[in-house]
């Protein structure tokens, strides 16, 4: 999907609510430094100072809209950033612009970091000739999931399930609590009815076969070494060709190619969100008529 179109997935009311909550966290009461900056109309340039993929424009727009500022973008969503890049210009009252600055930078840096990591993983997987799905996981930052899931999409990865209601995933603890794979899957199948797919985490071929026999749509082969993963997936697919196979656990960028194979449909990586470094952005005010520069001028 075109990264520019992904913004339409984000409900405006949700964007506004998130922006409001982040701003309230940063300034729940008196903003003393507003007396320093004043209220004069001001302008600032958003600079990208590290390479990567630009992601998070809708969130930055929502943050600055909450503080009565306007954003003009110079680069589209999903752009490859080559530092130092002039990304956007923000205009508004000085105290409002600076009130939104840190929240906006944090959000854009995090979202772009996830998108950059996702893009690297997708490129690595495609380099092997594998055509399956590179996906994230539910290992996201509490309160920041929408930003991180959106970043995955901009980077070209699949978001996987957004929450517990998006897919019935039966994990090892569910199997333990239910008293076995078949009991757990049958209960999940009844709960899912026709509307949701059921995925089952399995640690052996026997569990995978039991899950498929009980009606699982997807089987997650968790923490399999590559030399075990591919024969297991091949055997399972031979018996149950309609069951999708996901590989997860211990997958990193450096070993991702080892997990790509003809019987693997999805490879999910928690590190896409857990290990993604934030990109470096800065916001610098400049005087009307002056040439913006990516560093503060000192007189």
Curated annotation (Swiss-Prot):
- Please list the reactions this protein catalyses: nicotinate beta-D-ribonucleotide + CO2 + diphosphate = quinolinate + 5-phospho-alpha-D-ribose 1-diphosphate + 2 H(+)
- State the InterPro entries in the record: Aldolase_TIM, NadC, NadC/ModD, Nicotinate_pribotase-like_C, Quinolinate_PRibosylTase_N_sf, Quinolinate_PRibosylTrfase_C, Quinolinate_PRibosylTrfase_N
Q: Which PANTHER family match?
A: NICOTINATE-NUCLEOTIDE PYROPHOSPHORYLASE [CARBOXYLATING]
> Which EC number(s) does the record attach to this protein?
2.4.2.19
Name the species this protein comes from: Bos taurus (Bovine)
Species lineage: Eukaryota, Metazoa, Chordata, Craniata, Vertebrata
The UniProt record gives the binding positions of quinolinate as 102, 138-139, 160-161, 171, 201, 222, 248-250, 270
This chain belongs to which protein, by name?
Nicotinate-nucleotide pyrophosphorylase [carboxylating]
Key words of the record: Glycosyltransferase, Phosphoprotein, Pyridine nucleotide biosynthesis, Transferase
Classify the source by domain of life: Eukaryota
Which pathway does UniProt place it in? Cofactor biosynthesis; NAD(+) biosynthesis; nicotinate D-ribonucleotide from quinolinate: step 1/1
Question: Which residues does this entry mark as bearing Phosphothreonine?
Answer: 291
GO cellular component terms, A-Z: cytoplasm
Q: Where is this region: Important for hexamer formation?
A: 8-12
Record's function text: Involved in the catabolism of quinolinic acid (QA).
Which family is it part of? Answer: Belongs to the NadC/ModD family.
Q: Name one GO molecular function term.
A: nicotinate-nucleotide diphosphorylase (carboxylating) activity
Sorted alphabetically, the Gene Ontology BP terms of this entry are:
NAD biosynthetic process; quinolinate catabolic process
**Membrane-spanning parts:** none
* Complex formation: Hexamer formed by 3 homodimers.
What Gene3D superfamilies does this protein's entry cite? Aldolase class I, Quinolinate phosphoribosyl transferase, N-terminal domain
| SUPFAM superfamilies named among the record's database cross-references | Nicotinate/Quinolinate PRTase C-terminal domain-like, Nicotinate/Quinolinate PRTase N-terminal domain-like
Q: Which Pfam families match?
A: QRPTase_C, QRPTase_N
């Amino acid at each position: 999907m075109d990264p520019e179109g992904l913004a339409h997935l984000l409900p405006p009311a949700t964007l506004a609510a998130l922006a409001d909550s982040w701003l309230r966290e940063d300034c729940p009461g008196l903003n003393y430094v507003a007396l320093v900056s004043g209220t004069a109309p001001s302008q600032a340039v958003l600079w990208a100072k590290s390479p990567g993929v630009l992601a998070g424009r809708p969130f930055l727009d929502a943050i600055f809209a909450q503080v009565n500022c306007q954003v003009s973008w110079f680069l589209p969503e999903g752009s490859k950033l080559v530092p130092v890049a002039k990304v956007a210009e923000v205009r508004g009252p000085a105290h409002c612009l600076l009130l939104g600055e840190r929240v906006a930078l944090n959000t854009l840096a995090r979202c772009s970091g996830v998108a950059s990591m996702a893009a690297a993983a997708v490129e690595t997987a495609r380099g092997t000739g594998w055509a399956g799905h590179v996906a994230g996981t539910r290992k996201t930052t509490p309160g920041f999931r929408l930003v991180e899931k959106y970043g995955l999409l901009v980077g070209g990865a699949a978001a996987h399930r957004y929450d517990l209601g998006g897919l019935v995933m039966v994990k090892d603890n569910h199997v333990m609590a239910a008293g076995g794979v078949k009991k757990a899957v049958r209960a999940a199948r009844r709960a899912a009815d026709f509307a949701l797919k059921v995925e089952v985490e399995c640690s052996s071929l026997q569990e995978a076969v039991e899950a498929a026999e009980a009606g699982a749509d997807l089987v997650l082969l968790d923490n399999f070494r590559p030399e075990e993963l591919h024969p297991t997936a091949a055997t399972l697919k031979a018996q149950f060709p309609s069951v999708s196979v996901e590989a997860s656990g211990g997958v990193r960028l450096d070993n991702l190619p080892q997990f790509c194979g003809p019987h693997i449909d999805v490879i999910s990586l928690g590190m896409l969100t857990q290990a993604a470094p934030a990109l470096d952005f800065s916001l610098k005010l400049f005087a009307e008529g002056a040439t913006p520069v990516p560093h503060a001028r000192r007189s």
